Amino acid sequence: MEEDNLDLEGMDIHSGLDSSFHSPPHTSDPAGLSMDETDDIDDLINNVRPHDPLGTLEEKEADIKELTHSWVTERMSPTLLPTKEALLFRILKRVQLQIEVIEEKSIDMSPDTDVKLELLIVETELERIKYLIRSYLRVRLLKIDNSMEYYQSSPLDRMNMSQTERMYLNRHYALLKNLYAHQFMNTFPDSLKQMNDSSGSASMVQEPNMDHPVFVRVVKDTGRKIIIGNDSVKLRKGSIVVIKYSIIVKYVESGDVVFI
């Protein structure tokens, strides 16, 4: 996304997102709202929705579903998955549009209008979206922190990072090396100063645990069997399986199964 020149690192996620990111109406609402009440809330939100050149309402809702799916998948996967930088770019651009509209309506607000209620509903919905973005980014940064040496020595895995995440990795790694050197490593023999030494019985490079157990749901009835030792598991559509990530990863990548 370098051509769009969006500084994801400097974006203030606390500012909120586009009010169009709301769940579509359901016939049975868990909060006990009727269809008419849900439609009324949608109408209020529409009044605060700015003109958005980045997509239709359906496309915006699809972006939120994709973000939710990406967050769940990232949490379940022990490895760093390809970044959703383009998705975050679209959502964060809508943040800027929504901020302008909210500020304008807050300034022009009069006690005889329903603007206060409109803004309250929009801000409540924005909190949910902000939570998804923060959680998604925190999960990715946690993986980078836990396996810093591994990602530093793995150019292929670094391709899954955004430019901002690669900058974070390089800066954090440099700070950590400098701290260790000044605190204790300068007193060690040269043969013991390497932070990525894997010559001994225990490697200093902490790699992602590919045998981490994961929950998956089969979404395509392929009829394939997975052999695990003397046992086998058949991938039937709708079935839920707990299995090692290393065994199921190729089916996740092909879209036959999804994390839950």
Swiss-Prot record:
InterPro entries: GINS_A, GINS_bundle-like_dom_sf, GINS_Sld5, SLD5_C, Sld5_GINS_A
Subcellular locations according to the entry: Nucleus
Gene Ontology CC, one term: GINS complex
Organism (species): Yarrowia lipolytica (strain CLIB 122 / E 150) (Yeast)
Its biological purpose: The GINS complex plays an essential role in the initiation of DNA replication. Has a role in chromosome segregation.
Keywords: Chromosome partition, DNA replication, Nucleus
Keyword Cell division: no
Protein name (Swiss-Prot/TrEMBL): DNA replication complex GINS protein SLD5
Gene Ontology process terms (BP): chromosome segregation; DNA-templated DNA replication; double-strand break repair via break-induced replication
UniProt-listed SUPFAM superfamilies: GINS helical bundle-like (SSF158573), PriA/YqbF domain (SSF160059)
